[in-house]
């Protein structure tokens, strides 16, 4: 299987395990950060399924200071997919907490907000997608618990799917599959750095966070290939 089809393969495995068909009767919300994983996931869902897709971005305004950089990546990549893919819905929200530490776990916030969106637009989703993988037991349990709690008075509850968990556990190989499974234009639009510095009209990556190190390893490997 070529790298370009790795994400499609992961989606197929995910659907088979959870009895989904990928058809237009299935309603899904994609939690979208503008990073490499969520950008590739959204493109592949639009490309390889007929699911009714709603995309939601949370602008996380915290001590890491990446909110503006991510917002630009979200704007650029969503506009690209609006022009080059089938129709989908988009919404966004802001979570702001300026303290010494970011505070809390991203997955818990993502699943909480997914169900808030469901209530706000009066739409029952079958699936909540996130582009994460290797989610720790504690974080996964906390996030799933929040999702369950927010479905207390609902007749149905969406299933949380993280398709990239079906890919290889070898980090670099998985990254290559995610990266190469989207168009070249989108590869130039996503944002990864957790602690960027704003300079003039742009942003400079820190080069030290785990996301920057992942991107550096990916670039080196692709250059060697």
Locations of the language-model features?
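Nucleotide-activated chemistry modules centered on ATP-dependent adenylation/adenylyltransferase
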Residues: 2-225
């Amino acid at each position: 299987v070529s790298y370009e089809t790795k994400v499609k393969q992961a989606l197929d495995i995910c659907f088979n395990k959870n009895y989904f068909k990928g058809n237009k009767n299935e309603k899904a919300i994609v939690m979208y950060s503008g990073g490499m994983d969520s950008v590739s996931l959204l493109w592949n869902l639009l490309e390889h399924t007929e699911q009714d897709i709603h995309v939601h971005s949370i602008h996380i305004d915290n001590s890491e200071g990446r909110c503006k950089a991510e917002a630009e990546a979200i704007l650029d990549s969503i506009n690209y997919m609006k022009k080059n893919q089938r129709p989908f819905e988009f919404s966004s929200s802001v979570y702001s907490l300026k303290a010494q530490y970011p505070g809390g776990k991203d997955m818990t916030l993502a699943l909480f907000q997914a169900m808030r969106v469901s209530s706000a637009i009066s739409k029952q989703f079958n699936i909540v997608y996130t582009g994460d993988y290797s989610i720790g037991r504690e974080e996964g349990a906390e996030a799933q618990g929040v999702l369950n709690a927010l479905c207390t008075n609902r007749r149905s509850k969406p299933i949380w799917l993280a398709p990239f968990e079906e890919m290889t556990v070898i980090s670099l190989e998985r990254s290559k599959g995610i990266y190469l499974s989207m168009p070249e234009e989108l590869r130039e639009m996503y944002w990864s750095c957790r602690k960027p510095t704003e300079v003039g009209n742009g942003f400079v990556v820190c080069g030290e966070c785990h996301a920057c190190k992942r991107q550096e390893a990916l670039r080196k490997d692709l250059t060697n290939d």
